[in-house]
A protein has these predicted regions:
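N-terminal presequence-like segments and the immediate start of the first folded domain
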Residues: 1-65, 71-119
Length: 119
């Protein structure tokens, strides 16, 4: 049986992991640590958190397989896209999906990311 590595706890809760690694794949969740009322700014911060968490797990954004994006106002998706376009590795484009969702507190965006660790 292959082992599961849990990295954490999350900065939001001592009962959640920041990332989980299993079978050469890491899954991580990120929100913005700044709760400014700008989807663009929160997205930039959350994407930076993703990058840090991937590095902590032993991988990088060029190895991302899939990003599930949750935003509070789907009509503001172009703001997320602007942050994404500035951040994404254009030579290794991952799959992504974006849905509107009710999020906790002042969060405007939440990202669920899976990435490969093994080459």
């Amino acid at each position: 049986m292959s082992s599961i590595k849990r990295i954490g706890p999350s900065r939001l809760s001592p009962t959640r992991s920041r990332s989980v690694v299993h079978n050469g794949v890491v899954t991580t969740v990120a929100t913005s640590s700044t709760k400014v009322p700008s989807l663009y700014e929160q997205s930039r911060d959350a994407l930076s958190a993703v990058e840090r968490q991937l590095q902590e797990a032993g991988t990088e954004k060029s190895r991302i397989l899939m990003v599930m994006i949750y935003i509070t106002e789907i009509d503001n998706k172009p703001e997320f896209n602007r942050a994404w376009d500035e951040w994404v590795d254009r030579t290794n484009l991952p799959l992504r999906a974006c849905v509107g969702a009710a999020l906790e507190g002042n969060d405007l965006v939440e990202l669920v990311v899976t990435a490969s660790i093994e080459a």
